[in-house]
């Protein structure tokens, strides 16, 4: 090989190495930014809804999915930085699904050096026995799992139960209840458990599913698929998820507005007579902040600006 070719090859190798170094730097930067964003969003949700207080013992429900892994990881980070003291115990419910790799979670949790508990309960057989083939198992599975987790929380002395539901889950539940249950009802970030003994929290309430997916890849979490319910096709939740994904693609910002609307509810402008005292409403002679003036200030009512995805009415409609 001539000296010129050798010089060219060396220069090319140096250029490739420099590009590779820059790419790696960018990846590290983006991954660090993702971690900071998740910590900020989880911390904000905890603060906004007073999810965790000094002296709490938080039972983190770990399913082996990307979301619960992310939840545990971020809570462990925040615990080190928080101005308050709280304990974490990770709990997995082994439902005895066929081919469930029951060695993965114990091995992972031992590496973290945190308290954990594996609860063995054969809910899989119960669900398969009671639910006809082809029918959705989610509802019964959820009820059985919930009851077991409440009992385990009692046994472990945990007063808070942390679940890995994220922002997308909350919006999907909102539309599921609206479309199929005729209710304006979502998935609250904090609520009292059915038995009245615990507070259930969802610290990922502000976190997008896309971020937990990416974070799982970055952290290389040992994901365990759910063969009981996750593999079922044509679930209503999947239809809603597809609808929201399509909206986000066609009309950027719409899904963000929907999520924001869940925190800016005006009961006087809905139709729930239990939520607002329509029957007792009287004219007081004083202007009301949420009166008809609210309709005059709608941002979408100015000029002829069209709303993406909405067909405007003709004058004679």
UniProtKB/Swiss-Prot annotation:
InterPro entries tied to this protein: Rossmann-like_a/b/a_fold, TilS/TtcA_N, tRNA_Cyd_32_2_STrfase, tRNA_thiolation_TtcA_Ctu1
Binding positions for [4Fe-4S] cluster per the UniProt entry: 138, 141, 229
Catalytic activity: cytidine(32) in tRNA + S-sulfanyl-L-cysteinyl-[cysteine desulfurase] + AH2 + ATP = 2-thiocytidine(32) in tRNA + L-cysteinyl-[cysteine desulfurase] + A + AMP + diphosphate + H(+)
Pathway the protein takes part in: tRNA modification
Subcellular location, principal: cytoplasm
Enzyme Commission numbers on file: 2.8.1.-
Note: The thiolation reaction likely consists of two steps: a first activation step by ATP to form an adenylated intermediate of the target base of tRNA, and a second nucleophilic substitution step of the sulfur (S) atom supplied by the hydrosulfide attached to the Fe-S cluster.
Protein name, per record: tRNA-cytidine(32) 2-sulfurtransferase
